[in-house]
Amino acid sequence: MGVTLDLARAPAQPLAPSRPNLSGMTRAELAACLVELGVVRPEKAKMRASQLWRWMHHYGVTDFEKMTDVAKETRAALAEVCAISRPQVVERQVSKDGTRKWLIRMAPGIEVETVYIPDVGRAGALCVSSQVGCTLNCTFCHTGTQALVRNLTAAEIVAQVQVARDDLGEWPSPKEDRRLSNIVFMGMGEPLYNLDNVAAAIDIIADNEGIAISRRRITVSTSGVVPELAALGERTQAMLAISLHATNDELREKLVPLNRKYPIAELMAAIRAYPGLSNSKRVTFEYVMLKGVNDSPAEAKALVNLLKGVPAKINLIPFNPWPGSQYECSDWGTIERFAAVLNRAGYASPIRTPRGRDILAACGQLKSESEKLRASARRKLAAGG
C-alpha cells in the first residue's frame, strides 16, 4: 500500500474560490454565467461556452492561458472573474492490486472517498460517491455507519472523475484504450436521494465533446428508492444496478432497512418497468454473500424465481470485513455452489474479486476508516505530537 499524503499535515482548506468555478456547470449554466459576468456578449455565449467546455472536459485544462483558441483579452477577463478549480486531494492510497483510493475534500468538513478499480488490460471503473455519508443504515455496509452530512453537487460528482483523470494521466479524453472506461455510482450515499445532481453530473460526464464516457458505461446503483426508478431511467439512460442481497422481505428488512418502505414486490414491479430494459440493457443485481445468512442453495433458487423474466445478471460479492461488523464472508465453496445454481438457470453470475481490501477501498468499506484516521491525527496534533 502506498500513502502519498499525510492526513495530520493536511488541514482543512476552503475549496470554493471567491470566483465562480466553471468546472461543474452544465453547458447552459456555463453560457449564462459568462454573460452574467460580462465576459462575452449574449450572441457569442454559446460558442464561447463550447470552447471552454472542450478545454475543461476534453483536455482537462485548469489554466485559461492554455486555451489557445480563445482570444488573449478574453482569457485575461476570464481569469479575473472566474476559476476552473479542483477539490483538495487529502490522501491518495494505492493497493497492492493496483486499486487507487482518494480522500477528496470538497469543502471544510465535506470529504468523500473515490475508488479506481483497474480491470484486465487497460480498462477500469471509477466508483464515485453521490452523498457525504448515508441514511440507509444497511447492516453489512461500513459506509452506513457514517451519518449523512449532505448531498454532493453535480460539480462535486464530476470533480471526482476529474481528479481520477488527473492522477491517471488521461487528458485529453482518449477514444480507445482508456484506463478509466466505466463510471459506477456505488460509493458513499444513495444516488436516488440526490437524483437531480446525479442526473446533471451524468449529462456532463457523457457529453461527447468532453469526458465522453458513454451512458451505457455508467451504472447507477440503488438500494431501491422505488418512486425515483423511472425518473432515473428517463433522465439519465444509465445502466441500473440494484443492491438486493435477499429474496424475502423479512431478511431484506434486516439487511437493507429501506425495504420496510419499499418491499420487494414493489421494487420488482418498478424494475420490470424500468425504461429501456432489454436483453442488451440488463439490470445488475448485487448480492453480498454473508455466511449462514443468505447463502444457502434454497436462497439461490429463490433468487432465480424472484428474477424470472427480468433481463439480468447477478454480481455475487464476497463480504468485505470491517471493524465491528456482525457478519462473516461465506466460504468460497459455498459462493461457487450458489453461483452454479444461478448459472444453470441461465443467469450470468460473476463472483466479484475483492479489490483494494488492504486500503479499505472494497465494496462496503468506504469512509469510516478515514474518519478514524483523521480523528487520530487531530488528537496527535492537540497533544503536540
From Swiss-Prot:
* Gene it is expressed from: rlmN
Its source organism is Phenylobacterium zucineum (strain HLK1)
- Which residues are [4Fe-4S] cluster-binding? 134, 138, 141
Source organism's superkingdom?
Bacteria
EC numbers listed for it are: 2.1.1.192
Q: What is the lineage of its organism?
A: Bacteria, Pseudomonadati, Pseudomonadota, Alphaproteobacteria, Caulobacterales
Q: Which Gene3D superfamilies match?
A: 1.10.150.530, Aldolase class I
GO MF annotation: an example: rRNA (adenine(2503)-C2-)-methyltransferase activity
Classification via PANTHER family: 23S RRNA METHYLTRANSFERASE (PTHR30544), RADICAL SAM CORE DOMAIN-CONTAINING PROTEIN (PTHR30544:SF5)
The UniProt record gives the binding positions of S-adenosyl-L-methionine as 189-190, 221, 243-245, 320
Entries under SMART domains matching the protein: Elp3
UniProt protein name: Dual-specificity RNA methyltransferase RlmN
